């Protein structure tokens, strides 16, 4: 196809979602790369990695991951779960994060490497430029923390040109979204350990 035709067809993909990945091979999808790059909505490398990981995934699924950046599987919002006093979870923070910083997401499983943070937890580089510092938190005495819990969904990091696969066997917690923006996070959880990973 010519560039004008490709741009027109790609526009249809973006505007109406009428194209599906099952109608496009990786080679055909690559024809849209220039258009994708101009709009900042995709790349050949991340599209190929997405299709390798999701053979039945569509171009619409790909665009939804790029644009919505949802931590949850498509169409889901996490399952309401209660963390009780003494429950623990792990969190990656920026290397230069102040000691009192408590992020918004934690994970049940222990974090053992930066590769784990990037790939299993699907943490994009513009979310955390560094992630060597891991903190373990515990829910405060007398507290029940109502969170959303669920598997870690993939992310597409266009800035780094990477498909970050996530891990649907793991449990992540959206810790404070249900509580509003005015709360003090330290009223709910406290740090019990901090360690460095490579």
Kindly label every feature range from the protein language model.
Residues 16-198:
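Catalytic toxin/effector domains delivered as secreted proteins or via bacterial secretion systems
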């Amino acid at each position: 196809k010519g560039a004008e035709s490709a741009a027109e067809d790609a526009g249809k993909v973006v505007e109406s979602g009428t194209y599906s990945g099952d109608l496009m091979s990786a080679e055909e999808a690559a024809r849209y790369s220039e258009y994708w790059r101009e709009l900042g909505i995709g790349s050949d490398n991340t599209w190929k990695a997405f299709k390798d990981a999701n053979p039945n995934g569509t171009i619409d699924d790909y665009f939804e991951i790029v644009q919505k950046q949802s931590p949850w599987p498509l169409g889901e919002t996490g399952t309401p779960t209660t963390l009780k006093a003494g429950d623990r979870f792990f969190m990656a923070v920026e290397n230069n994060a102040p000691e009192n910083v408590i992020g918004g997401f934690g994970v049940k499983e222990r974090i053992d490497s930066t590769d784990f943070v990037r790939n299993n937890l699907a943490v994009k580089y513009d979310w955390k430029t560094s992630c060597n510092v891991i903190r373990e938190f515990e829910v405060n005495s007398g507290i029940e923390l109502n969170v959303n819990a669920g598997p870690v969904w993939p992310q597409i990091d266009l800035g780094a040109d990477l498909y970050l696969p996530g891990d649907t066997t793991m449990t992540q917690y959206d810790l404070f979204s249900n509580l509003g923006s005015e709360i003090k996070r330290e009223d709910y959880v406290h740090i019990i350990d901090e360690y460095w990973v490579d």
